[in-house]
């Protein structure tokens, strides 16, 4: 197995508005998440979130404590949320064993233990996407499925944004220090998410897009309300959203995305909305 990581530094909005396409993609887009028998991570300076993925194909992959953590184990001072977006898989955390099927999630609290990822079938490997944030105390590990989620049905087919927001790793379902994660599924014929757009200066966010055909693409919108920019994305890619940025998208096909947040509070509804007509 191989572990790869990179550090992404935070940007001031006054600087970011001058970025060209290449710089925007380099600073905010995370293209390489799933590579066979690799664990790939981005250590972001936005609330020190780690965004990553593991794709075990015939090997057991270990979540290693990368150097920026300066810790004996990855979870020594961190909590994490994991989603399986591939075939059936297994996550082991110390002596605990969790089987995760497609679109099932797992919360792991902080503590010194080894975490491993494996697939049940190498011909249909599991794909583990994860977010991790710093934690001030330990909370119990827990597997969470859509049956456990707080579900909000939003939008309409007429508005091209009919979707179910599955709030899964949130404080309405289980205790966390600062991590919140969920999964939004767009209905066939709907392509817009998070519109009207909002920001939440108390929390940063990361979006991971999947379930979109290879010949289609997602156009993710970011930036300040009056200085928006776009990032064209494919499936199985993620994008960082600073606390000062909107985070919305339209695509050429319906899709699903996993959102993860961390920062000042655990209030999902703490959002500052903008009128669609105010976007520039």
Curated annotation (Swiss-Prot):
A Gene Ontology biological process term: D-glucuronate catabolic process
The keyword Metal-binding appears for this protein: yes
Catalytic reaction annotation: 5-dehydro-4-deoxy-D-glucuronate = 3-deoxy-D-glycero-2,5-hexodiulosonate
Cofactor comment text: Binds 1 zinc ion per subunit.
Residue ranges of coiled coil: none
Names of the cofactor(s): Zn(2+)
SUPFAM superfamilies: RmlC-like cupins (SSF51182)
Span of the signal peptide: none
EC number of the protein: 5.3.1.17
Entry-linked Gene3D superfamilies: Jelly Rolls (2.60.120.10), pectin degrading enzyme 5-keto 4- deoxyuronate isomerase, domain 1 (2.60.120.520)
UniProt keyword Isomerase, yes or no: yes
Enzyme superclass (EC): isomerase
Pathway(s) of this molecule: Glycan metabolism; pectin degradation; 2-dehydro-3-deoxy-D-gluconate from pectin: step 4/5
Family indicated by similarity: Belongs to the KduI family.
PANTHER family reported for this sequence: 4-DEOXY-L-THREO-5-HEXOSULOSE-URONATE KETOL-ISOMERASE
HAMAP family xref list: KduI (MF_00687)
Task of the protein: Catalyzes the isomerization of 5-dehydro-4-deoxy-D-glucuronate to 3-deoxy-D-glycero-2,5-hexodiulosonate.
Protein name, UniProt field: 4-deoxy-L-threo-5-hexosulose-uronate ketol-isomerase 1
GN (gene name): kduI1
């Amino acid at each position: 197995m191989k572990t790869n990581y990179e550090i992404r530094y935070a940007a001031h909005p006054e600087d970011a508005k001058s970025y060209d396409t290449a710089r925007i993609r380099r600073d905010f887009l995370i293209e390489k998440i799933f590579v066979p028998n690799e664990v790939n991570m981005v250590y972001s300076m936005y609330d020190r979130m780690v965004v990553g993925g593991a794709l075990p194909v015939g090997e057991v992959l270990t979540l290693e404590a990368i150097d920026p953590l300066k810790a004996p184990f990855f979870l020594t001072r961190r909590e994490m949320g994991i989603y399986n977006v591939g075939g059936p898989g297994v996550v082991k955390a110390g002596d605990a064993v969790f089987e995760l099927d497609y679109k099932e999630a797992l919360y792991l609290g902080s503590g010194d233990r080894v975490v491993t990822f494996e697939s049940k079938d190498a011909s249909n490997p599991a794909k583990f996407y994860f977010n991790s944030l710093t934690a001030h105390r330990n909370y119990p590990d827990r597997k969470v499925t859509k049956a456990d989620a707080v579900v909000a049905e939003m939008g309409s087919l007429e508005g091209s944004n009919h979707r179910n927001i599955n709030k899964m790793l949130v404080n309405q379902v289980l205790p966390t220090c600062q991590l919140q994660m969920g999964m939004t599924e767009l209905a066939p014929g709907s392509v817009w998410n998070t519109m009207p757009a909002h920001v939440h200066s108390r929390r940063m966010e990361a979006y991971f897009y999947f379930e979109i055909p290879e010949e289609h693409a997602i156009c993710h919108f970011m930036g300040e309300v009056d200085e928006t920019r776009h990032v064209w994305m494919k499936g199985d890619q993620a994008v960082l959203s600073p606390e000062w940025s909107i985070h919305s998208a339209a695509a050429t096909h319906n899709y699903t995305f996993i959102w993860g947040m961390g920062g000042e509070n655990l209030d999902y509804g703490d959002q500052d909305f903008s009128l669609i007509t105010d976007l520039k």
